């Protein structure tokens, strides 16, 4: 099958909780930019979320019980809330439904049909080599069939709309290689239906968490994108620093606060702050003669976060107050994605000798 004439970009985001700065600089910022560069498809991966939903419910119950509560959110409530949050977050941060196709994975049921068909040409050995499966099981995720066959569903997500470009992090390259393998298995067994998707490896920075490790929900060290007020200040002021005395020179290159500040600042602003680290008494008059400390740097970081995400927070509040509009966006995206999916499945069914799908 010939590849689309233009760039067809696809990426999914799993609804697994509040988005944080690591998500933004690692993926979301790139996704928003890519909607201007090709035919972009972005989906909320609620089918994928089912593989870890019970663990999410257990964490919710554990947190509630530790807080002395007797009720907590069910798995169903967690999934619905997380899907809604992803939709609100992406739209507030600049995803434009007039430029990109934005939809829920579960609103395109053709994906599950293609998943089954791909599974019939995919060897067990390929899936057994998936490092993400082993990693998740080692972290206590229940080893279900769904978790084991996760790469097949991911391949179906990509191939169902004949995407040829997929923005991924380095930890996801293996899944895309497996997608190419599955596309090749099908094309060789039946007919040349699928294009060969290629990875788009961005230069996403490693975002440090509040404890200095990579920012991740699993480490509990995140700064949420849409946190504000006291919650945001508490997170920023909790960023770990060393014990260098206030009046002593400090090394910006080993400081978590400086690393976070650089993500928001211009090169000139970062250079200024670095100089302030090295010369704590610089501009001391503005601080009533006091040396510059990590607390001052955290205040600068806090101001940068507010400046970057303040307008998006307001947009998110407006969208949250209008759930019908958000649902309309997702439904419209699903209609467009399903139109592409049906074209692909028609060719797949023809290739394997199945009858055409009944008209709806």
PLM regions and their residue ranges:
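Conserved RecA-like P-loop NTPase ATPase core
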Residues: 90, 171, 212
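Conserved nucleotide- and phosphate/pyrophosphate-binding catalytic cores
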Residues: 21-23, 63, 174, 180-360
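Short catalytic-loop micro-motif centered on adjacent basic/acidic residues
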Residues: 101-104, 167, 244
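Internal, conserved structured core segments that host functional sites
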Residues: 135-182, 186, 190
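Short, polar/flexible loop-turn hinges at active-site or ligand-entry regions and domain interfaces
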Residues: 73-76, 166-169, 247
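N-terminal Rossmann-like or analogous alpha/beta NTP/dinucleotide-binding catalytic cores
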Residues: 2-10, 15-156, 268, 307, ...
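A generic structural motif
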Residues: 15, 166-167, 221
